[in-house]
Amino acid sequence: MRGIHPSRLTSLRQARRGGTIPAQIGMTAIAGVALIAATRTVVAGNPSGLLAAGLAFLLVCAVVADRMRQGYPHDRIGGCNVVTLMRAGLVCALLMPFLAGDAGGWAVAAVAGTALILDGLDGYLARRSGLASRFGARFDMEADAALALVLSLHIIAGTAVGIEILVLGATRYVFVLAGMALPWLRADLPHRQWRKVICVIQIAVLILLQVPVLTPDQAIAVARMAALLLAGSFAADIRWLWRHAT
């Protein structure tokens, strides 16, 4: 890594491969599985759903450990990445009621709302502790995308809103797949506060649609308005990437 003293680089490599980072991720994995088990007291679930959620979270932890080993620029994961991992744990916990056939509802909304609130904490902790990184920003984005997808599946299974809700839940993954064919889509985007605002609106709408406070027609209208906002955001990003492609 450029600009890092050789002794510092050696310390980072040791932390990633066999030092503090694997141990910290291991402890966080245990805490996350415990969080998922505790969430089962709030949301519907059965033993097979709990097992699936736990295994999904352990897979997330394994992927995080691998990505950190490849290029994480710090020697500890920090509270910021612990919070993001716990958010991922809550997303995995939401698989339990979905797999149990009890999609949506107030409990699902409460768990998802907690994950949304924590979304503002990990970035703050990263900046305050000096542990901000491209990895952390990407991990935060992927946690948001996973939450949106799982909530969309709940909506399809439990409400009158149809498969069109996947515009809110799967657009990020379509964008990533498109980037595999079009390399210019993988370029870094400039920071835009409106992008974060639209993400919050996206998740908030998906949470709102979990609970029976809107008529079916109102729910569909709200979903479509949020989808238009999200589509506009992605269109603006794609336009910027196209104009700056080399």
List each model region and its residues:
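A feature for the membrane-embedded catalytic helix bundles of lipid/isoprenoid biosynthetic enzymes
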Residues: 1-77, 141-246
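Membrane-embedded alpha-helical segments that form the functional core of polytopic membrane enzymes
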Residues: 49-63, 76, 82-133, 217-231
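Active-site His/Glu-centered metal-binding helix of metallohydrolases
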Residues: 89, 117-125, 138, 142, ...
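Short, surface-exposed loop/turn motifs that are enriched in glycine and acidic residues
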Residues: 111, 136, 164-167
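Cytosolic-biased juxtamembrane loops and peripheral soluble domains of multi-pass membrane proteins
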Residues: 131-132, 136, 187-190
